[in-house]
Amino acid sequence: MDTSSTFLVLALIKDHQLIGHVQKSCWKHQSEEIFPELTARMDRNGLKPSEIDQVVVSKGPGSYTGVRIAMTIAKVFCAMGNKPIYTVPTLELFAGKAAHVRVLLDARGQRVYTAVYENGQLLGDVSVQSCADIAGECGSENIVGDGHLVNREDVWPDLAQHFLDLEDQWHLEPNVHLVKPVYLKSTTAYLTGIH
């Protein structure tokens, strides 16, 4: 599950196949939509909560509140049901297994979370940069995510499929109670309203 951007993403995977999924834009409404959408997908597949044997959740970076929505639900479900919890970095989820791609996600305040991936592997670092700075670095790179922040087209991949594609890269967390979201802060001071 992922709620780190403008989307609510849920994927039900059984025997390495997607059996139910949703990816819908519902910015600031993910917390209202997640349970009805999850229940609908489970009902369509005849699943009860007790039959879910593990949960995979994106861990950030992304929208501060958004990352916490999916993370909290995943942690509570896994803790109550004594189920394993896996995590995947949000930008890695957006990149999937693309040959070469730069991920851009809105970090607010004219900033962007960004990283470059090659076949599902991170090249360099995940960072927060100003939109103006990163626009010059993008060149002709393939971009997924909030392209409009650098005067490019927004490109939204099939994130449910990416959860499945990245199955070999899910990280099993040893203790559900210690799983924490990843937050990045800009290295440049971000001040407003100071004269």
Where are these regions (language model features)?
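Oxyanion-binding and handling regions
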Residues: 1-18, 29-32, 86-195
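Hydrophobic packing within well-folded, soluble alpha/beta domains
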Residues: 10, 34, 52-55, 77
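N-terminal phosphate-binding loop and adjacent alpha-helix
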Residues: 27-43
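Buried hydrophobic packing segments
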Residues: 38, 73-77, 95
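DPxDG-like acidic metal-binding loop motif
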Residues: 54-84
